[in-house]
Amino acid sequence: MKSIKKALALLIVLTMVFAFAAPVAHAKARTTKIGVGLYQDSGAAVSAVKAYLANLEDTLNVKFTYTVLSNTDEAQNITKVQELIAAGCDGIIITMDMGTEAILQECADAGVYCAGYLCDFDSSFRTNYDNVFKNELFLGTVADGGCADEARRGYDFFDSVIEYNERTPDAPIRHVAMTVFPAFAFPYQQSFAAQFVEKVEEYNAANPDKAIEVDPLSDETDILMFRPMDSTYFSKHPGIDAIVSICSGSFVYPTMVSAGVSNTMKLFAAGYNDGDEAVFGSKGAYQMEIVSPVEAITYPLVLLLNKINGAQFPDQPAEAERRGSSVLIINSDEDLAKFQHSIYLSFKPEDAFLTPEDVVALTAYNNPDATYAGLVEILDHMTIDDIK
């Protein structure tokens, strides 16, 4: 993080120098309005995103307005984008690849730019590339961690289980089961489950005396249709020590509590929910959580602001890109202590990886030395170890 902070500090200084040396096109005289279509309307991540963006408003002369998109209803997403356009938004950030081509047509009719966040737009990338990624109104997207062709989420879960076993050699995990969301909404979660199994099999071959048993995914109990896990899960998977929930732990932990196993069984999960810290690590069932840094939204935001203000980077790609970002992986009490000083948990702007001045320095319309490569680089420096 020190290297990125030094680079940003230099960009800030250069921005100030150019500001005094010659007229620079700073933010528009009128306030730029950006619409943000999130995947839900509440929760820690939503609160953190809003806290981060609210802290940027005065410095960037931007106003943010919010709506909620659907991962199953294309018509709803189109309607929500129409509402953002009608509200006067100059640019829109969306978190769902559902109805994207139609959304871009709405943007074209209104002269509004669009970019993505927390989504790799894999469906559009694979089946509709020309109409989305080559569309001049779509500026690119930053994924939730890695993009589909580079994601290693299953390996992250494996690493966390092994780290737990090394930390607690007297009570290691020897038998696990998994949960995922349905493939129609999250097509790569079963691939992540396969990654996890692959690593376990490699580990077992090298460490037969420490072998870990993994139950195969059951269509009956393990694919959670966006509702809490059924209590029959435990009869389907008798004798397990832990659950690897590649989908959100919030769909699993309440069932563990009601079944009376939350004090004896461990949970490795994606996502973070309010209050999880009270039952994390040495305090309870949760032993791992993975969250995306909310500051990654800086990538689509800067791309939008550059376009709206008539600027672009000298190294701007000819076509929109999808980029992965680092993630916050919380594996221990020590990691949790760091996480409590992130904006994701504190909602305090001063705990963000980037200040408003950092973001200004990343924009081409404020800083002639800003580059696309510099914007992409910040996405790699938002891990648990970067929290100081």
Where in the sequence are the language-model features?
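Sec-dependent signal peptide cleavage junction
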Residues: 18-30
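Hydrophobic alpha-helical
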Residues: 53, 78, 82, 91-114, ...
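Acidic/His-rich segments in extracytoplasmic proteins that coordinate ligands and/or metal ions
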Residues: 65-163, 175
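Hydrophobic alpha-helical segments within soluble ligand-binding/sensing domains
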Residues: 131-177, 226-227, 271-277, 293-309
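Hinge/cleft segment of the Venus flytrap/periplasmic-binding protein
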Residues: 303-388
